């Protein structure tokens, strides 16, 4: 199989690998996949963790290997977590942002600067009239907010 075709197939397959903590969003949509390389009988995927201590990393690695082995049963699959560049919330694709909203999770603002006021739009009614209930949500990457317009609590991805 031609290497370029194989690389494209790997990227397409990785779009099926969901973030275990955000099951409507793929690791590609989250901007976690840094690179894909195919050489001979080997496929290597480099993944940027959203947070260094993320407890889902082992599951993500297992899912990547499982999906790629189904496509390339004879290939050696290698998954590496890379820390040479940090993941930022700007890496989330537009499709990923929409899928987060469908799940009731507000995506982070684009081009957020540390120290800047964090304005979060409600994923249900799209109102900016929201308040932070708890900076610490169910995972390290999420916070809990409340919409004063539609009266719904919701989670938001922290901007980094």
Could you describe each region identified by the protein language model?
Residues 1-160:
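Domain-level signature for proteins that mediate thiol-based redox and metal-cofactor handling
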């Amino acid at each position: 199989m031609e290497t370029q075709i194989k690389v494209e197939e790997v990227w397409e397959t990785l779009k099926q690998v969901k973030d275990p903590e955000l099951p409507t969003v793929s690791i590609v949509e989250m901007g976690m996949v840094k690179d894909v390389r195919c050489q001979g009988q080997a496929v290597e995927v480099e993944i940027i963790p959203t947070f260094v201590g993320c407890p889902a990393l082992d599951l993500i690695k297992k899912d990547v290997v499982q999906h790629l082995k189904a496509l390339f049963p004879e290939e050696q699959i290698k998954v590496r977590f890379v820390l040479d560049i940090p993941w930022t919330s700007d890496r989330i694709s537009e499709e990923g942002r929409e899928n987060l909203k469908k799940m009731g999770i507000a995506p982070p603002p684009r081009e957020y600067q540390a120290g800047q006021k964090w304005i979060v739009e409600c994923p249900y009614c799209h109102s900016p009239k929201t308040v932070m209930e708890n900076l610490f949500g169910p995972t390290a990457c999420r916070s809990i907010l409340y919409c004063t317009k539609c009266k719904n609590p919701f989670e938001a991805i922290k901007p980094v």
